[in-house]
């Protein structure tokens, strides 16, 4: 029988078993070190005292702090390693304390020339005698830090350097940055200064009031003394000048009583004429008819009407930003692109990382990585601004985990707009947290577009509220068009409205035409007076009022607000577009400005002519890059969050700016509207009233109930050409297909053309 060679094979341990074994070893070593540190901390026996003195030899009198820190690290090392800046901050603070303790030891025992020997002597004495009584300074590590520091900055300077290290370490450990602390102190100083100025003004007002009361009291006393002196004088005969006796005074005849009649006050009427302006025109005179009015006792709304701002805690974002910086650099490195993140700005809704590419890196390589960056950062979407205007950096905008709401009150307090500029409006906060405002008179018209629920209507309400906060009814007038009937109807009956909010789309085109007529009237007025714009005319009025007793009223600005342009374009596209184009071309100098809002940013609503005449645009979140290009002529709006954030592209900038719009609640709007209604009643201007329209008038635009106003022109065209087709009428009369079809039906009813015969052309019955 052959002997079988039996061999035992040892199974290799798996990776999990090795890791478990290493973990057990680490745990046992950590437990042993922890036990030794506890013996040293409580100085248990000769071993504990010896261990404590050995630690003192290294770190001096900071041994307890070192033991406590080591114990925490042994038990929580996994959590500590994840906290960026915690270890480095602790070591920086510890180094500062070592410097200060060692400097104090040198000063106390006069160890200027023998720092090392003196420090060793303090610890060795206790070590050999099993004591822990003497002060050990900063130990050997403290000596190593103290000697070069004292050589450079002296013993006193060492205290200063140690304090700086403690401060820097505290900043590294804390969740706040230097910018946050500086901003905190600057805000505190600003509040203190504001309170100081307010108290100073109050003291000045009180002093003025006291001085006024004192002057009034002195004048009253002086008047009483004068009256008393006059009463003491004897009566005098007015004809002879002789002093009358008491008997003569009693014999004077009684004075007959007369009824007092209230005088009739006649308000003067005058035309505004300037003597230096000569009228050489042979045209019909243009009457400048402004009746003088009494000063309007009107109080502007206060910020107290709006809900106070709730504090926002974005400390969590700072921790995420530090992690994202590492992820960004690692992601770019994985694609072979070398970049450095220069800085990160935390905004209300997004954080902007400013990235500097290395020399030779093409910008489009970074721009094409937006989806990969969104994947790496686990972000909803990433918007890349390449490059940042005015900087040699590329901006990467990443949504925040928590969006901080910007309240209307907060934005208004930070914007610091000029009170005399009624149309300077705060729009939102930029990524760096600064408030951004725009001047509507310079835009001069604004297009606001975005999908449903993206914040468009809230932004329009914020713009209206901003104007109402600064302007009286005689300074700014509104014409509001709201086909949805729910967005702007709350503003009905405020004194700033020219007419009630227009909710009928059929009336809207007529209302816009009334504004066009007002624009033409104003230009005729400017030509009559000899000025170029509304500012020049109002300056003339002010000059005239200062020189004449007949007071004239300056022209108010007119702001036309259309909340849903798409509805108007569906009903009367040609008339609405013509009115918008005319206003866009000429209305700026006349003081008339438009704000057009739509939730359907397509080319049939925002036509090329409208875009050409409304150069300033605001884009909220849209569904596609096509819609973004329709609004802004470039992509970007499809990357927005849809939480009130927007891309603002004013007329004077080539690239859009990302802003977080302010939130104004319905309660805030109602409070400011109710306050304004208590100040003055609505005073509508009948000249802007579009009047009543019939059911089919909107279909025929400017026509009456009897038919289309182009009927006669279409009839002449058909008889002249002896051809009748909807496409010909549509092409020759520049009307839509639906209107051309209705004209064909009217021509058939009138007997001009025959009925349709399938694919054959209609017969023309009249010659």
Curated annotation (Swiss-Prot):
Main localisation: membrane
Species name: Streptococcus pneumoniae (strain ATCC BAA-255 / R6)
Gene coding for it: ftsK
Ranges of Acidic residues composition bias in the record: 685-702
Sequence segments annotated as region (Disordered): 685-705
InterPro entries, per database record: AAA+_ATPase (IPR003593), FtsK/SpoIIIE/SftA (IPR050206), FtsK_alpha (IPR041027), FtsK_dom (IPR002543), Ftsk_gamma (IPR018541), P-loop_NTPase (IPR027417), WH-like_DNA-bd_sf (IPR036388), WH_DNA-bd_sf (IPR036390)
Protein name: DNA translocase FtsK
Similarity section: Belongs to the FtsK/SpoIIIE/SftA family.
Alphabetical list of SUPFAM superfamilies matching this protein: P-loop containing nucleoside triphosphate hydrolases (SSF52540), Winged helix' DNA-binding domain (SSF46785)
Residues the entry annotates as binding ATP: 453-458
Compartments it resides in: Cell membrane
Its membrane topology: Multi-pass membrane protein
Keywords in alphabetical order: ATP-binding, Cell cycle, Cell division, Cell membrane, Chromosome partition, DNA-binding, Membrane, Nucleotide-binding, Transmembrane, Transmembrane helix
Entry note about domains: Consists of an N-terminal domain, which is sufficient for the localization to the septal ring and is required for cell division, followed by a linker domain, and a C-terminal domain, which forms the translocation motor involved in chromosome segregation. The C-terminal domain can be further subdivided into alpha, beta and gamma subdomains. The alpha and beta subdomains form the DNA pump, and the gamma subdomain is a regulatory subdomain.
One Pfam family recorded for the sequence: FtsK_SpoIIIE
PANTHER family associated with the record: DNA TRANSLOCASE FTSK, SPORULATION PROTEIN RELATED
Job description of the protein: Essential cell division protein that coordinates cell division and chromosome segregation. The N-terminus is involved in assembly of the cell-division machinery. The C-terminus functions as a DNA motor that moves dsDNA in an ATP-dependent manner towards the difSL recombination site, which is located within the replication terminus region. Required for activation of the XerS recombinase, allowing activation of chromosome unlinking by recombination.
Residue ranges of every copy of the FtsK domain listed in the record: 433-629
One BP term from GO: chromosome segregation
Segments crossing the lipid bilayer: 28-50, 54-76, 85-107, 127-149, 156-178
MF GO annotations: ATP binding; ATP hydrolysis activity; DNA binding; DNA translocase activity
Quaternary data: Homohexamer. Forms a ring that surrounds DNA.
Membrane topology, Cytoplasmic segments: 179-767
Gene Ontology terms: cellular component: plasma membrane
Keyword Manganese attached: no
Disulfide bonds: none
């Amino acid at each position: 029988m052959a002997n079988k060679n039996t061999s035992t094979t040892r199974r290799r341990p798996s990776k999990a078993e090795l890791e478990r074994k290493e973990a057990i070893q680490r745990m046992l070593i950590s437990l042993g070190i922890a036990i030794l540190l506890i013996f040293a901390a409580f100085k248990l026996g000769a071993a504990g005292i010896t261990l404590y003195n050995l630690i003192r030899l290294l770190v001096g009198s900071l041994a307890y702090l070192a033991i406590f820190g080591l114990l925490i690290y042994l038990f929580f090392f996994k959590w500590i390693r994840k906290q960026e800046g915690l270890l480095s901050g602790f070591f920086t603070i510890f180094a500062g304390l070592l410097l200060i303790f060692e400097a104090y030891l040198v000063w106390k025992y006069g160890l200027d020339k023998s720092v090392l020997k003196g420090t060793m002597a303090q610890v060795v004495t206790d070590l050999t005698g099993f004591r822990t009584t003497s002060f050990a300074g900063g130990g050997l590590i403290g000596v190593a830090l103290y000697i070069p520091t004292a050589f450079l900055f002296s013993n006193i300077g060492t205290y200063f350097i140690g304090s700086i290290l403690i401060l820097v370490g505290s900043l590294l450990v804390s969740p706040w940055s230097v910018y946050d602390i500086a901003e905190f102190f600057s805000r505190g100083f600003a509040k203190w200064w504001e309170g100081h100025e307010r108290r100073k003004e109050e003291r000045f007002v009180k002093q003025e009031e006291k001085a006024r009361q004192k002057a009034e009291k002195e004048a009253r006393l002086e008047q009483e003394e004068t009256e008393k002196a006059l009463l003491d004088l004897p009566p005098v005969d007015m004809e002879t000048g002789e002093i009358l006796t008491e008997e003569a005074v009693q014999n004077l005849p009684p004075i007959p009583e007369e009824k007092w009649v209230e005088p009739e006050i006649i308000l003067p009427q005058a035309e505004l004429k300037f003597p230096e302006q000569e009228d050489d025109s042979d045209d019909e005179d243009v009457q400048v008819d402004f009746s003088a009015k009494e000063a309007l006792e009107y109080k502007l709304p206060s910020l107290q009407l709006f809900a106070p701002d709730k504090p926002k805690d974005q400390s969590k974002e700072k921790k995420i930003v530090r992690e994202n910086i590492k992820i960004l650099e690692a992601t770019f490195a994985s694609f072979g692109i070398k970049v450095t993140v220069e800085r990160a700005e935390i905004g209300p809704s997004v954080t902007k990382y400013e990235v500097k590419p290395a020399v030779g890196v093409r910008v489009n390589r970074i721009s094409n990585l937006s989806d990969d960056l969104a994947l790496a950062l686990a972000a909803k979407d990433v918007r890349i601004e390449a490059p940042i205007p005015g900087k040699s950096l590329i901006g990467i905008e990443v949504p925040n985990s928590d969006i901080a709401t910007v309240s209307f009150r907060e934005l208004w307090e930070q914007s610091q707009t000029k009170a005399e500029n009624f149309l300077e409006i705060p729009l939102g906060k930029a990524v760096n947290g600064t408030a951004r405002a725009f001047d509507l008179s310079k835009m001069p018209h604004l297009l606001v577009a975005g999908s449903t629920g993206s914040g468009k209507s809230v932004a329009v309400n914020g713009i209206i509220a901003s104007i109402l906060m600064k302007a009286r009814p005689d300074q700014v007038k509104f014409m509001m068009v709201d086909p949805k009937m729910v967005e702007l109807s709350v503003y009905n009956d405020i004194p700033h409205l020219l007419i009630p909010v227009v909710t009928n789309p059929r009336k809207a085109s007529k209302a816009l035409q009334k504004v066009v007529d007002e624009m033409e009237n104003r230009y005729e007025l400017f030509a009559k007076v000899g000025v170029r714009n509304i500012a020049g005319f109002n300056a003339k009025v002010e000059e005239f009022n200062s020189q004449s007793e007949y007071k004239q009223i300056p022209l108010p600005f007119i702001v036309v607000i259309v909340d849903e342009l798409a509805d108007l374009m569906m009903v009367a596209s040609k008339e609405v577009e013509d009115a918008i184009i005319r206003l866009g071309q000429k209305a700026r100098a006349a003081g008339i400005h438009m704000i057009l809002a739509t939730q359907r940013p397509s080319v049939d609503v925002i036509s090329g002519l409208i875009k050409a005449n409304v150069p300033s645009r605001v884009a909220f979140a849209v569904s596609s890059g096509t819609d973004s290009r329709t609004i802004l002529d470039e992509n970007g709006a499809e990357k927005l969050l849809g939480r009130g954030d927007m891309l603002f592209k004013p007329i004077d900038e080539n690239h859009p700016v990302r802003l977080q719009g302010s939130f104004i609640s319905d309660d805030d709007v109602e409070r400011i509207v109710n306050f304004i209604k208590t100040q003055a009643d609505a005073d509508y201007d009948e000249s802007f009233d579009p009047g009543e329209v019939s059911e089919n008038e909107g279909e025929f635009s400017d026509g009456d109930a009897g038919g289309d106003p182009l009927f006669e022109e279409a009839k002449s065209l058909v008889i002249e050409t002896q051809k009748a087709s909807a496409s010909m009428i549509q092409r020759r009369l520049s009307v839509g297909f639906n209107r051309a079809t209705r004209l064909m039906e009217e021509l058939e009813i009138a007997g001009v053309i025959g009925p349709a015969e399938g694919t054959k052309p209609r017969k023309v019955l009249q010659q």
